[in-house]
Amino acid sequence: MTKRKLHNNWIIVTTMITFVTIFLFCLIIIFFLKDTLHNSELDDAERSSSDINNLFHSKPVKDISALDLNASLGNFQEIIIYDEHNNKLFETSNDNTVRVEPGYEHRYFDRVIKKRYKGIDYLIIKEPITTQDFKGYSLLIHSLENYDNIVKSLYIIALAFGVIATIITATISYVFSTQITKPLVSLSNKMIEIRRDGFQNKLQLNTNYEEIDNLANTFNEMMSQIEESFNQQRQFVEDASHELRTPLQIIQGHLNLIQRWGKKDPAVLEESLNISIEEMNRIIKLVEELLELTKGDVNDISSEAQTVHINDEIRSRIHSLKQLHPDYQFDTDLTSKNLEIKMKPHQFEQLFLIFIDNAIKYDVKNKKIKVKTRLKNKQKIIEITDHGIGIPEEDQDFIFDRFYRVDKSRSRSQGGNGLGLSIAQKIIQLNGGSIKIKSEINKGTTFKIIF
């Protein structure tokens, strides 16, 4: 099916609506004007006919002259006087006036008739005349030539007005539709550019139409979300390719070792299988963390948000950690004030364990970790402090980047992927919080989480 252009369709529709509206309007106006003018012509004819009748009542018939009759007539009028026997007594008509023969026709026709003669319409009014010395009737012939000319002029004016109005409407519609469709054309072209070149540019439309500007803003927001989703997917692929390469190479190497020696040497088989399983577990954990970072539900927090009692959650997690790491000392300094926050419970547990796990990894000597909470200026503050190796100042701006490791020589042996702090930062930001870091080499690190 052939699709029509919105631009052309708009012009056609608006022009047709305008034309039909003007056409109907002109017809109504002409109808009322014709009726008014026709009634005016009829009134003039009847008035003249009445004046003729009054003339015959004012003086004897023998004293009435043609001059008297003409004085009672208006423009474009003639008069014929008949006696009661249909004999013509007076006539002011000429050769160009409609002929009305005496006899049956005008004896019995209605008082007012309309006849056409030589292309001109006439009104003929029959008026009885009865006086003391005369009995007959008059036929007043009123030409409608002037009326017809006025009506014709009205039709011509209406037609000219309709044509001019249609042309003006079509021109205005063309200009207006161009302004309306121009942003849509720009939108279409921008989509083509994005499909071809990517998300480098935004749609810039400066119009006087709120709807068009809202459309452009919505489009830009949609493109930003699509770009973010696209970048997340690309980042996931890049990160996965980068981090999966090493464990996959290790697994491949041990599988080759099993194929070559493991069939005959149980020790080699056992060792290679254990290492392969360990690397597979590392891959699974890595993929889970990558998926956590690339989730797109940034704005969908409130649907599962619950009231989290911070101090209660920390006490519960610390109790479990003491059982899991009996060689570590966990000190707590929790405020007596009730600290609450709206968020998904598993997210709070996840980010808290990320910081504790990070402290355990890098505090292998003193093995002393402190957790402190307080309320300041309506802000809920959580501080997690270790006494480990610390973070160099030049590294502190990058520790939340994906796969960034401060102690690069030890991170793989400690099982880290460099994603934990990135995940924690994302959770904190999604819930309207912020994070600060304070660290000194060989003295320890404090992470301050603020909600």
UniProtKB/Swiss-Prot annotation:
Any single GO CC term annotated in Swiss-Prot or TrEMBL for this entry: plasma membrane
All copies of domain HAMP, residue ranges: 178-231
Entry-linked Pfam families: ArlS_N, HATPase_c, HisKA
Phosphohistidine: residues carrying this PTM: H242
Record's bilayer topology term: Multi-pass membrane protein
Keywords linked to the UniProt accession: ATP-binding, Cell membrane, Kinase, Membrane, Nucleotide-binding, Phosphoprotein, Transferase, Transmembrane, Transmembrane helix, Two-component regulatory system, Virulence
Parts of the chain that traverse the membrane: 11-31, 156-176
Protein name in UniProt: Signal transduction histidine-protein kinase ArlS
Organism: Staphylococcus aureus (strain bovine RF122 / ET3-1)
